[in-house]
Amino acid sequence: PLADKELIDSCYNLLDRNMMLETDGIYGQISVIDATTSEVLAWASLEKQLDGDCGWCGDMVYVPFKKQVCSTDIFVPFIAAKCLEESNTSLGKMVDTGCGILEVNDSLQIRDHNWRRGGYGKVTFEKALLMKSRIGMYKAFMTLPNGADLWEQAYDTIQKSNAIELAISFNQMYHQRSSLEYVKKIATGIFEKTGIQHRLAPRGIKLAGIYNILQCDDNKRSSDEFTFVGCFPADNPKYTISMVVVRPHKLPATIGMLSKEVNQLVEWLMNRNL
């Protein structure tokens, strides 16, 4: 069985020596599951201890796997794809994302990450989702009668999930039988040339998944949250993995901060089977 000491040690070493140092993380998780059965093969959980003199500068220690450490808003592009599928809306249909800022009502303003550069304008729904346009995703939700409620639920930033649950949920989404397979198209396309995360893809291995950053930008959170979830090889997945790192709010923060460690684990797992 793959759930052995070598795999578990590899996960802990990746957390301790790489992920936590790279992001200045204070708590991190990794999970590896079998993509065909959803069986948990390995997990790791580390936390930096508080030091009375210098705050979060204590030693890194093994800790029990916490159940509520991250939100689930990483899945919004995939839920948007499912909304389009359920409403029989083509990925090729044009959607106007405007200049990158959408005033929905007095209490809801949606901004794309490139709003300062003028947004994406008119693009296909597929392009909007592959570029993680929040306006494009919102309009995908609105193709369903209950889209507004679904949007509010999907963008809930409450810390209610963890790396194991993210991996299992994504695995179910990716393998859900569908004639259109919009979720698969978006999950794989994000790491291809037309996708926003194509520069983060591992070499020689087709990856399906997504990175996400949730930053403290609204005075409601005191921490930044880096997450990844994905499966590989995308055409016939053997593994689904997820990583979560939490740190006190600070800048800079880039979506690729976990990519080196994700790709190391992906390549290590694939080479292990050769």
Model-inferred region functions:
Residues P145-H175, K184-N273:
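Active-site beta-strand/loop architecture of penicillin-binding DD-peptidases
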Residues M20-I33, L91-D96, A140-F141, E152-Q153, ...:
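Surface-exposed patches in mature extracellular/periplasmic domains of secreted proteins
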